[in-house]
């Protein structure tokens, strides 16, 4: 029996592009942009795999977007406003818009980390501040 079009597995849609930010050699995680692949445009849902030594992004703070992360597997570090906090499977973290709380998730372990990331889909009105990379 064929699966319906609105059912997919994250491994089938993960972007294996090993690039990072333009002009930077740092490699980030691999993301499956689930919402867009399923035709959902009001939600931004992604499954991210962080190999050892990688992070989700530059530390950043959303000015007008909400963001949520749920740890599926592994024990990554939450970097938040310059402090590290160890996370575990089942932990969730939320950032309401406009708080100015800078954050990223880092894999400082020797095994892969898997995250479910939910936010509002990118729109031109959304502004992001990168405190350690203000030129972005």
Language model features: what each stretch is:
Residues 58, 78-79, 95, 102-108:
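Short beta-strand His + acidic residue motifs that chelate non-heme Fe in jelly-roll/DSBH
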Residues 28-33, 46-62, 100:
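Conserved short histidine dyad/triad with adjacent acidic residue
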Residues 1-42, 127-136:
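A short, N-terminal "cap"/entry segment at the start of jelly-roll beta-barrel domains
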Residues 47-51, 61-80, 118-121:
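Short, conserved beta-strand element in jelly-roll/cupin
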Residues 106-136:
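Double-stranded beta-helix
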Residues 51-55, 75, 84, 99, ...:
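Short, charged/polar surface micro-motifs in flexible loops or helix N-caps
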Residues 82-98:
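Short acidic-glycine-tyrosine-enriched beta hairpin
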């Amino acid at each position: 029996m064929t699966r319906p079009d609105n059912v997919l597995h994250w491994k089938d849609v993960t972007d294996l592009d090993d690039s990072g930010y333009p002009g930077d050699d740092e490699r980030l995680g691999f993301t499956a942009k689930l919402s867009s692949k399923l035709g959902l445009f009001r939600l931004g849902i992604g499954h991210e795999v962080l190999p050892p030594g990688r992070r989700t992004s530059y530390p950043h703070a959303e000015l007008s977007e909400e963001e949520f992360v749920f740890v599926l597997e592994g024990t990554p570090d939450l970097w938040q406003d310059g402090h590290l906090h160890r996370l575990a499977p089942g932990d969730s973290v939320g950032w309401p818009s406009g708080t100015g709380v800078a954050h990223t998730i880092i894999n400082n372990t020797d095994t892969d980390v898997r995250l479910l990331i939910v936010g509002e889909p990118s729109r031109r009105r959304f502004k992001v501040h990168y405190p350690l990379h203000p030129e972005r």
